[in-house]
Amino acid sequence: MSRAVGIDLGTTNSVVSVLEGGEPTVIANAEGGRTTPSVVAFSKSGEVLVGEIAKRQAVNNIDRTIASVKRHMGTDWKVDIDGKKYTAQEISARTLMKLKNDAESYLGEKVTDAVITVPAYFNDAERQATKEAGEIAGLNVLRIVNEPTAAALAYGLDKGKEDELILVFDLGGGTFDVSLLEVGKDEDNFSTIQVRATAGDNRLGGDDWDQRVVDYLLNQLKVKGIDLSKDKIALQRLREAAEQAKKELSSSSSTNVSLQYLSVTPDGPVHLDEQLTRAKFQDLTKDLLERTKKPFHDVIKEAGIKLSDINHIVLVGGSTRMPAVSELVKELAGGKEPNKGVNPDEVVAVGAALQAGVLKGERKDVLLIDVTPLSLGIETKGGVMTHLIERNTAIPTKRSETFTTADDNQPSVAIQVFQGEREFTRDNKPLGTFELTGIAPAPRGVPQVEVTFDIDANGIVHVSAKDKGTGKEQSMTITGGTALSKEDIDRMVKDAEEHAAEDKARREATDTRNSAEQLAYSVDKLIADNADKLPEEVKTEVQADVDALKKALEGTDDAEVKTAFEKLQASQTKLGEAIYSQAGSPDGATGAAGAEGAAAGDGSKADEDIVDAEIIDEDEAKK
């Protein structure tokens, strides 16, 4: 049975983990890092770059490099590369494919099953888009799990037998969640982890802190009469510098942002050298920090607990490393210190791997009960939002309610599904619409239409409507207005596979070119260093092959390079044969070379000098 992996598909960075012997292990990527930047780039030659290599080249390839695509999941966002439009799902799939490949390299086997995490406050369309990204990447998505829930799973399994409340404060690169979970164990050491309440903001994360620094630096330049707000290259360099400054200010009280030749104006080059203190940084971002308070208070209120009831506070997401964040959490929690014993970058992926192990039967000692983050309902007369499933309801769940017609002899009803907490549907998120037709003619208020909402364990919604009078039924899986059809997903899977094959071919061609250059250089040097020892015909033949390879390397035909490379690989052996035959002749070189020549050229003599014996310990022999 193939193993399943757990994937934290983050806005800024992503992580993959797997269970080994029942315990989670974070898998390092091909570059040696335990986190992989969620950055995808299309090089001008057509190669798709993912991760650290994509991030490093961003400043020179701005329009073809995509970062923070997670913020576009579940929307109709697209990016145009060479006339082809890519959806957020397709770009995310590239990151997932890299994580999948790195896991396969580590495990030495194919990986097809995965648990992927999403922010707890992701709506239905965003969850569906994440599942589709996994499918495009060639993964069978076993489960979509909320990030704070996964973190609590990783943190809470080693807790004692008493029921304990864990508050997870998750501030990532692009999203923010707060969740309260109850963790308990029975006498058989079986753990139950149940989400009590969750709240969040899908438009708040470390990227916003970075942007405040970028805006500040742009304003500092504007004061000097320099406007770089439209300079894409300068903006990318500023973004990278802002992210680095944010990280440095987590451990230092001040940092220096120094960017030489940031841009060029008619007056000459623009250099930036600006000191940024932690106090100034916190002042620039204080309103962002303020936005984390309401979700925190909402969770405490919805769970109906006191702050003193919280046993553990876990910080998740790289952005929680900012001192102002951990100080605020301590303040909000009534002075309780957050736990510092977990890696905020890795704990979500570790929890996802544990859940993958549960679903595959590798772990049988835990039950995870999640909740739906937002209320679900339909539009009724007057545009009213009528809830069928309230937020923070444990999932999977199923609810039904009976509605009637608004007009006499109404032949059909439109079922419009919404997600949100507002009183009117216009203020909530529309998820989809379908129509139930064939209702028997009757005065208004007489027909009975039963609407059923069914939320699966992934948090994805299925809705059905049934006319109790005629028995007619209509149903749909809510996939959001921007979800992909089965045909779209199949096409994108095929496209991704083709790209993977192209990328592999390109890598092989590059490796061949590198090896060919090295071979041409070394053979050239060997001929030059041993010119007096080589017969003219051998020297001429091999040199011709070297020259042919060099000429092929100047061109763009990879097949020609490969052919010339293989030809030189074969012919260069004649050089060694000629050199060693010279060394073995009576007037040739003696010593080490001569001995080596004898070993290589005179097998019978060498065999005569070999004594077949074994070593015996004298003391052992006497026993």
Swiss-Prot record:
Q: Where is the composition biased (Low complexity)?
A: 587-603
Task: Supply the InterPro entries for this chain.
Answer: ATPase_NBD, Chaperone_DnaK, Heat_shock_70_CS, HSP70_C_sf, HSP70_peptide-bd_sf, Hsp_70_fam
| Keywords linked to the UniProt accession | ATP-binding, Chaperone, Nucleotide-binding, Phosphoprotein, Stress response
What segment(s) does the record annotate as region Disordered?
Answer: 496-515, 579-609
Query: Which residues are recorded as modified (Phosphothreonine)?
Result: T175
Q: Which PROSITE patterns match?
A: HSP70_1, HSP70_2, HSP70_3
Q: Does the keyword Phosphoprotein apply?
A: yes
NCBIfam families, per the entry: PRK00290.1 (NF001413), prok_dnaK (TIGR02350)
> What protein family is recorded?
Belongs to the heat shock protein 70 family.
Q: What is this protein called?
A: Chaperone protein DnaK
Originating gene: dnaK
